[in-house]
Amino acid sequence: PVSEAMFMRDASMLTSVFMQVIIFATLFIFIYILIKRVIINNLQKINDTLRRITQGDLNVTVDVRSNSEFSSLSDDINSTVSTLKRYIAEAAARIDRELEYAKQIQLSALPTNFPEKENFEIYAQMIAAKEVGGDFYDFYKLSDSTVAFLAADVSGKGIPAAMFMMTAKTIIKDLAESGLPVNEVFTRANEKLCENNESGMFVTAWMGILDLTTGKMQFANAGHNPPLLKRANGEFEYLRTRAGFVLAGMEGVRYRVGELTLSPRDRLFLYTDGVTEATNTENKLYGEDRLLSFMNQNATIEATAFLPALKANIDEFVGEAPQFDDITMLM
């Protein structure tokens, strides 16, 4: 009887312990499911939304409202993203204003009164890209019988390029008006532009000085695209000569002078790489061959009509692709 009583007591205790374990296990599972549903799942939703936000989707919102804490967290995240979107929009608007300012710097520096004389005619066009570069052209009389002209392209984009363009244009003009030969203009301009050029910007340029009475022209090339020359009874051909180094690229560079004589009805075309490097949606370049072909197919058109026609041809080739570089042309 005693052993039987002890057995019954032990069995009762084991049953009680077993039931307690089952109850606690059931309670634990219930609490886990509740926590997962209320907290973990909601945190997962928030993390998924934050992942999309960090990937750049700022239009998505957090909308977890299971309790006041999650509602407050959702509102805080949405408010932060909204503020970020506003800052981004303001920064984009500021950049657009700066780009427009840079364009105005470019355009205001370019001559727009194109002379028409009995033995000389010049016309130029510069079409700025959205991402402003530093293209420029210039022409001016050095004497009653001498005129200087050039096309140039500054490296870089935005306001720094536009400001460097203004500096280069002013230096070159001042040196040319002092009576220096064209190669010496480039040699001294290079030295001046190298001074305090911590940004490492540089300029490609092609410049000619023409004597209107004799037709003799001296020219220099600082790493620029070769111009095209058409004799009165011939076709356009590239005027390929040995180009010097870019301006502001390195101190101590000296530039060669080239010479040729222009006759009545000869034509000379200067341009920047925005023409030949215009790219279409298939990532193909407009290129030198296509430019030469267009030039010869339209060789008799007056300059004032020719340059817009060439730009239209470039636009047709490019199609829907954006214009990434300035396009500058002078004839």
What do these predicted ranges mean?
Residues 2-46:
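Cytoplasm-proximal transmembrane signaling helix
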Residues 39, 66-73, 95, 118, ...:
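The cytosolic transmitter module of two-component sensor histidine kinases
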Residues 55, 59-70, 127-128, 140-141:
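HAMP-domain connector/hinge
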Residues 2, 70, 77, 82-95, ...:
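Interdomain signal-transducing alpha-helical coiled-coil linkers
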Residues 86-269, 321-330:
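… and, occasionally, acidic/histidine-rich disordered N-termini of signaling adaptors
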